[in-house]
Swiss-Prot record:
Positions with biased composition (Polar residues): 1-11
Top-level taxon in the UniProt lineage: Eukaryota
PANTHER family: PROTEIN BLI-3 (PTHR34818:SF1)
Segments of this protein annotated with the region Disordered: 1-24
Protein name, as recorded: Protein bli-3
Listed Gene3D superfamilies: Electron Transport, Fmn-binding Protein, Chain A (2.30.110.10)
Induction: By blue light.
Pfam families: Pyrid_ox_like
Amino acid sequence: MSGQGFSNADTGNKPADPYKQANLDTEVPLDQKINDLSSFMTSNKFSMMTTRDSKTGYLLSRCMALAATESGGIDLLFHTNTESGKTDDLKSDEHINISFLNSTTGDWASVSGTASIVTDRDLVRKHYNPHLKAWFGDLGDGVHDGGPEDPRVGVIRVKMVTAHYAISTKNIVGKVADVAQGVITGKPATVNKLREISEQEVQSWRSSH
């Protein structure tokens, strides 16, 4: 398998991806990068969780609500039915992606990591929400009732490895104006702060939280 990337153009000494170069935010300290990302994820709550289907090998996404964060905001917890297909996927391949989008502002986040399925009742009870009963149902056997002691109720813990995200720097009027200017001048629009959190930065953060 070749490690060479894809290219369809030679731009010489000009940036091949001028939008990224114009918006990449590399001067922000790590604590701000983490805190801004964590705030964005918790405020949006709903994400798309992508796993590799254990039967077909294809990527599969589904909407999941963020239940809580750990390790100073970098690790994510989600409620899960332990008998669902996604737990089979994660047993087969622990690699996972979690993405968030604010469709109003255009802000987004993508978290790559590894996931584990946790059935520890203390953790389940800590983050249990009565609304989960609507998704688990009560099977009427006195055990599988959708409550915190229901063995089907588990937690998916996602440990971040890397993250990429974008937060808005302008309101909608400013964005439209900047994009319009870009169409006329060919200058890339500067509408977001693109930030990257490396594997080394994640490890450094986790060691102190």
